[in-house]
């Protein structure tokens, strides 16, 4: 579960390394976000000489959480870190590569471009 002030790793090569969640999109008083939710975040750490810079406000979709994800078939998935992929206003990823495994639920939420870039889909 991701809430405001939560730090996340960036799972793509967009230029950001670490994000801090400042808003969860959806409802006006939504407290937690899970895999597949879109958040508004600020870049806390960035790679030098890249298009994204520190303290820039961006949108991102959550691809991994430490909190368990229960599937309908009884399977439980848990990751070692909280990670997100930076997206633009249309929902397309800003980077050209995605690092690490991502959940299959992103395909059902119409993030097919992120799923196609991922090396492993669980």
From Swiss-Prot:
* A cellular component annotation (GO) from this entry: cytosolic large ribosomal subunit
Q: What does this protein do?
A: Binds to 23S rRNA.
Can you name this protein? Large ribosomal subunit protein uL14c
Q: Which GO terms describe its molecular function?
A: large ribosomal subunit rRNA binding; structural constituent of ribosome
Gene Ontology biological-process entries: translation
- Where mainly found? plastid
Q: Any idea which UniProt keywords this protein has?
A: Chloroplast, Plastid, Ribonucleoprotein, Ribosomal protein, RNA-binding, rRNA-binding
Q: What does the similarity note say?
A: Belongs to the universal ribosomal protein uL14 family.
Record-linked InterPro entries = Ribosomal_uL14, Ribosomal_uL14_bac-type, Ribosomal_uL14_CS, Ribosomal_uL14_sf
Q: Which domain of life is it from?
A: Eukaryota
* Subcellular location per the Swiss-Prot or TrEMBL entry: Plastid, Chloroplast
Subunit details for this protein?
Answer: Part of the 50S ribosomal subunit.
Record organism: Piper cenocladum (Ant piper)
Cited Pfam families? Ribosomal_L14 (PF00238)
């Amino acid at each position: 579960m991701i809430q405001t002030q939560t730090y996340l790793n960036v799972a793509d090569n967009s230029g950001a390394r670490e994000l801090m969640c400042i808003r969860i999109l959806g409802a006006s008083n939504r407290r937690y976000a899970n895999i597949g939710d879109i958040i508004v975040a600020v870049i806390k750490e960035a790679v030098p000489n890249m298009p994204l810079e520190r303290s820039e406000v961006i949108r991102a979709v959550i691809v991994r959480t430490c909190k368990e994800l229960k599937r309908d078939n009884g399977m439980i998935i848990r990751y070692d870190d909280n990670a997100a992929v930076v997206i633009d206003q249309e929902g397309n990823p800003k980077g050209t590569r995605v690092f690490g495994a991502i959940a299959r639920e992103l395909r059902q939420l119409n993030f097919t471009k992120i799923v196609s870039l991922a090396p492993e889909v669980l």
